[in-house]
Amino acid sequence: MYLTQNLMVKVVQIFTIILFFSSCKSTKSLTSNQAQKQEVYQNKSIVFQIKSLKAINLEEDLTLADEIMLTYSLTAVDESNKVVQVANGSWGVESMKKGQIALSERFKSIELLLPFKGKILSSVILTEIEDYKKAQNTVKKINEFGGLGKIPAMFISLGEYETPLAIVFASLQAAGIGLKAIEHFDQDDLLGQNTFDLPVATLSSTQKLYPVNLTFEGEHFKNKFHYELVYELKITEK
């Protein structure tokens, strides 16, 4: 099916934003295709839960606190790398001081029905916020519409080397959250991004928990920041 003119404009806008942040270029742009159903286990889900976020060192020295937003997604893709199910969550905007820890009860979990084939991509983006009000509205909208798995009307195909930022954008777009809710990302400081790849074929009947430990560190205007993020993926059965 050919893209409509409006949809093409949106895709171009997303790709432009992605290029602004990406440390490496994708070999393929995001494209949309006619929706097709993917078989899923009706009694099995995969749940994403943040366990902790710790500020070891801050990006902002003058204010002695960073205004932080964490955005995360579960994206199910089929064997052709088409997005077939998405769930999104967000946390913030929170003022984090050096040494401060945010624990699991402060983060909303998200979940998907486990597909028979393909893979699950769990992606996280940590940003230091410039526009507080706009970011708060984004967090509210993502959490209002994105917590449970959704099958998009138009599937989005990911390129082979998409960044975590690109994957989260695709997941938000597939969930119908739209460009207006995520356009603030081009004004914020990206502190870290990561995607964990979990092929369905590699899942074990005995292993139910998949912990992910991440370190985000770097330098911005001579300020060295350092954050540690821990989350887990859990396979549940009803």
Feature annotation, model-predicted:
Residues S32-K238:
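N-terminal amphipathic/basic membrane-interacting segments and domains
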Residues F20-S23:
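C-terminal motif of bacterial Sec signal peptides marking the signal peptidase cleavage site
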Residues K25-K28:
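Bacterial signal peptide processing site
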Residues Y2-V12:
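Bacterial N-terminal signal peptides that target proteins for export
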